[in-house]
């Protein structure tokens, strides 16, 4: 369950988005949604058949996050100044899938995809 210090946000800050996109990836405009309080961006690479999603949302009072711990290994990592949780699992082809979640300044963030770990971190650090 998330805790919010002070008043919870009513909307994401103006211009809040992911600002780093790895070479060869394009946003899937059909799958994206953007609202005042949250967004979901989906990216894929036709060359490598890799994909990832970026989701940010203001924290709602009483909001919870659920984690699959049967097929995923979790560790704590730093995302800028924030503590994040990195989940590592494998897809049906044996390729690593990463799920990085953290909260910062009243906003929950998740970057998930079957792309290299260092790209997951660059994407995460480019959200502002």
Regions found by a protein language model. Name each.
Residues 105-128:
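Surface-exposed amphipathic alpha-helical segments
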């Amino acid at each position: 369950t998330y805790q919010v210090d002070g008043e919870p946000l009513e909307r994401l800050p103006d211009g809040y988005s992911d600002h780093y996109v790895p070479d060869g990836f394009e946003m899937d405009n059909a799958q994206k949604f953007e609202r005042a309080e949250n967004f979901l961006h989906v990216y894929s690479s036709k060359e490598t058949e890799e994909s990832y999603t970026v989701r940010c949302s203001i924290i709602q009072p009483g909001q919870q996050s659920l984690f699959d711990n049967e097929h995923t290994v979790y560790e704590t990592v730093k995302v800028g100044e924030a503590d994040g949780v990195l989940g590592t699992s494998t897809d049906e082809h044996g390729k690593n899938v990463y799920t990085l979640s953290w909260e910062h300044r009243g906003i929950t963030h998740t970057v998930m995809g079957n792309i290299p770990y260092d790209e997951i971190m660059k994407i995460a650090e480019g959200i502002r």
